[in-house]
């Protein structure tokens, strides 16, 4: 189920004639094998989820399976700016559309990274990635007998609370809600950037029934940023652990064309970036992922560079 990164995306510019620190990420990244006993000391670890089977099940457009390596290529040439270490754990493949096995493999890899003291940043792949990442984080907390509160922050145009099965990119947070209920644990879910035009009344009803906190895209613009950050900071202060997942289709299509479902309105990039920084600087962010980047529909690699920028913000 684990596959190597293809065609070595970790290549970039060497500024041999310049004076001073010209180190770029491709110069510091190291591969990480799941069998290694290395202790990671909080270092970020990239993990690809090369899967769009859930997107296809959700009647979306194929192509997100190629997202992880495209984001790596965009990251490779980014200046390291003092980042001491970066690891790459390769990609999880989805073979023959077997989404469930791919999600279990992802969960195992996330758990492995966390158990070794790393910070997993998962590169999707469709938003079905969230079910795998959450399972891996939950398994890690269980192994430590840690019953602290876990806050899920999802920046997304969609609730992804569909109750239909088989599971898809539209069901991960319903699956998480059901798992929390079975375990007798709270389902602390905040969804930021919800589009009223992309979610049916049934999905809003489901969100209300589950006690989901959400903010619509019209209230996630730059003029609202200070209020949103204050509200989110209060939520983070009241929890023990944070899982951040960013569905890139929350961004306006002018900024993020490379997704299955481009947003006509969307949440501005500066707002998304500030939320990511708030989560990272809280000291409570345990895992994060970037979902739905689809290079097949990108324009001039703009979406890849935007995804890489958000990834870079989460690395340090």
Curated annotation (Swiss-Prot):
Endoplasmic reticulum keyword on record: no
Return the broad EC class. hydrolase
Which residues are recorded as binding Mn(2+) 1? 127, 156, 160, 247
- GO molecular function terms attached to this record: agmatinase activity; formimidoylglutamase activity; manganese ion binding
Q: Which reaction does it catalyse?
A: N-formimidoyl-L-glutamate + H2O = formamide + L-glutamate
Please name the InterPro entries in this protein's record: HutG (IPR005923), Ureohydrolase (IPR006035), Ureohydrolase_dom_sf (IPR023696), Ureohydrolase_Mn_BS (IPR020855)
Q: Does the keyword Ligase apply?
A: no
The positions annotated for binding Mn(2+) 2 are 156, 158, 247, 249
Co-factor binding details: Binds 2 manganese ions per subunit.
**What metabolic or biological pathway is this protein involved in?**
Amino-acid degradation; L-histidine degradation into L-glutamate; L-glutamate from N-formimidoyl-L-glutamate (hydrolase route): step 1/1
Tell me the keywords, alphabetical order. Histidine metabolism, Hydrolase, Manganese, Metal-binding
State which Enzyme Commission number(s) the record gives: 3.5.3.8
Q: Which GO terms describe its biological process?
A: L-histidine catabolic process to glutamate and formamide; L-histidine catabolic process to glutamate and formate; putrescine biosynthetic process from arginine, via agmatine
Its transmembrane ranges are none
Q: List cofactor names only.
A: Mn(2+)
Tell me the domain of life.
Answer: Bacteria
Q: What role does this protein play?
A: Catalyzes the conversion of N-formimidoyl-L-glutamate to L-glutamate and formamide.
Q: Which family does it belong to?
A: Belongs to the arginase family.
| Protein known as | Formimidoylglutamase
UniProt source species: Cupriavidus pinatubonensis (strain JMP 134 / LMG 1197) (Cupriavidus necator (strain JMP 134))
Instruction: Supply the source organism's classification.
Output: Bacteria, Pseudomonadati, Pseudomonadota, Betaproteobacteria, Burkholderiales
